[in-house]
């Protein structure tokens, strides 16, 4: 058996091939797992659990079917869907996890997270993140009419795209000191995260021992998952 991790699907109506690929994954590989962990940015945007978007209802039903089949499903918020709440989690049968979670997997201690908090060199993004994660601001935003939230979200995505176009790739990647600090804080030798869209397995030193950082890929033209078993930790890419 295996535990599966995915992230950065960025599901939206404009990318039906990704949605179809995810549905096939849920109906196939996910049903064989010990557990499924979604490490953020499942959706391209999330403006509230009350959004009647048909795609959201479709995904809730598909994930719920996996959960009902006996495979526990877990979710860590990403920078795109940090407002996903308890209502959608209940409808989809997912358990919401904190932004950093340590798992005991087949004899390994593994830290999982979305990964945006590791990109500490991007001071502008971190300041924005701190602002939009303020509970009072989230409460205020979610109280706005749905059409207003949609306009705000569209403007924020456009601003983010424009800002990122002028940033260096290095600034938008993780900071190595932040990585080591997180792994040493939690006393782990394994870290699995997404966010950067740069799939790879990195070797480093943490806790004065060899350690590994496994980065999930985004679902653009193919699927990406990390498969953890008693024998191995594999980063796997597969066609939709």
From Swiss-Prot:
<feature type="binding site">
    <location>
        <position position="195"/>
    </location>
    <ligand>
        <name>Mn(2+) 2</name>
    </ligand>
</feature>
<comment type="pathway">
    <text>Glycolipid biosynthesis; lipid IV(A) biosynthesis; lipid IV(A) from (3R)-3-hydroxytetradecanoyl-[acyl-carrier-protein] and UDP-N-acetyl-alpha-D-glucosamine: step 4/6.</text>
</comment>
<dbReference type="GO" id="GO:0005737">
    <property type="term" value="C:cytoplasm"/>
</dbReference>
<feature type="binding site">
    <location>
        <position position="114"/>
    </location>
    <ligand>
        <name>Mn(2+) 2</name>
    </ligand>
</feature>
<dbReference type="Pfam" id="PF00149">
    <property type="entry name" value="Metallophos"/>
</dbReference>
<keyword id="KW-0441">Lipid A biosynthesis</keyword>
<dbReference type="GO" id="GO:0019897">
    <property type="term" value="C:extrinsic component of plasma membrane"/>
</dbReference>
<feature type="binding site">
    <location>
        <position position="8"/>
    </location>
    <ligand>
        <name>Mn(2+) 1</name>
    </ligand>
</feature>
<comment type="function">
    <text>Hydrolyzes the pyrophosphate bond of UDP-2,3-diacylglucosamine to yield 2,3-diacylglucosamine 1-phosphate (lipid X) and UMP by catalyzing the attack of water at the alpha-P atom. Involved in the biosynthesis of lipid A, a phosphorylated glycolipid that anchors the lipopolysaccharide to the outer membrane of the cell.</text>
</comment>
<keyword id="KW-0464">Manganese</keyword>
<dbReference type="InterPro" id="IPR004843">
    <property type="entry name" value="Calcineurin-like_PHP_ApaH"/>
</dbReference>
<dbReference type="InterPro" id="IPR010138">
    <property type="entry name" value="UDP-diacylglucosamine_Hdrlase"/>
</dbReference>
<keyword id="KW-0997">Cell inner membrane</keyword>
<feature type="binding site">
    <location>
        <position position="122"/>
    </location>
    <ligand>
        <name>substrate</name>
    </ligand>
</feature>
<dbReference type="GO" id="GO:0030145">
    <property type="term" value="F:manganese ion binding"/>
</dbReference>
<keyword id="KW-0443">Lipid metabolism</keyword>
<keyword id="KW-0444">Lipid biosynthesis</keyword>
<dbReference type="InterPro" id="IPR029052">
    <property type="entry name" value="Metallo-depent_PP-like"/>
</dbReference>
<dbReference type="GO" id="GO:0009245">
    <property type="term" value="P:lipid A biosynthetic process"/>
</dbReference>
<feature type="binding site">
    <location>
        <position position="79"/>
    </location>
    <ligand>
        <name>Mn(2+) 2</name>
    </ligand>
</feature>
<feature type="binding site">
    <location>
        <position position="160"/>
    </location>
    <ligand>
        <name>substrate</name>
    </ligand>
</feature>
<feature type="binding site">
    <location>
        <position position="197"/>
    </location>
    <ligand>
        <name>Mn(2+) 1</name>
    </ligand>
</feature>
<keyword id="KW-0479">Metal-binding</keyword>
<feature type="binding site">
    <location>
        <position position="41"/>
    </location>
    <ligand>
        <name>Mn(2+) 2</name>
    </ligand>
</feature>
<feature type="binding site">
    <location>
        <position position="167"/>
    </location>
    <ligand>
        <name>substrate</name>
    </ligand>
</feature>
<feature type="binding site">
    <location>
        <position position="195"/>
    </location>
    <ligand>
        <name>substrate</name>
    </ligand>
</feature>
<keyword id="KW-0472">Membrane</keyword>
<feature type="binding site">
    <location>
        <begin position="79"/>
        <end position="80"/>
    </location>
    <ligand>
        <name>substrate</name>
    </ligand>
</feature>
<comment type="similarity">
    <text>Belongs to the LpxH family.</text>
</comment>
<keyword id="KW-0378">Hydrolase</keyword>
<feature type="binding site">
    <location>
        <position position="41"/>
    </location>
    <ligand>
        <name>Mn(2+) 1</name>
    </ligand>
</feature>
<dbReference type="InterPro" id="IPR043461">
    <property type="entry name" value="LpxH-like"/>
</dbReference>
<dbReference type="GO" id="GO:0008758">
    <property type="term" value="F:UDP-2,3-diacylglucosamine hydrolase activity"/>
</dbReference>
<keyword id="KW-1003">Cell membrane</keyword>
<protein>
    <recommendedName>
        <fullName>UDP-2,3-diacylglucosamine hydrolase</fullName>
        <ecNumber>3.6.1.54</ecNumber>
    </recommendedName>
</protein>
<feature type="binding site">
    <location>
        <position position="164"/>
    </location>
    <ligand>
        <name>substrate</name>
    </ligand>
</feature>
<feature type="binding site">
    <location>
        <position position="10"/>
    </location>
    <ligand>
        <name>Mn(2+) 1</name>
    </ligand>
</feature>
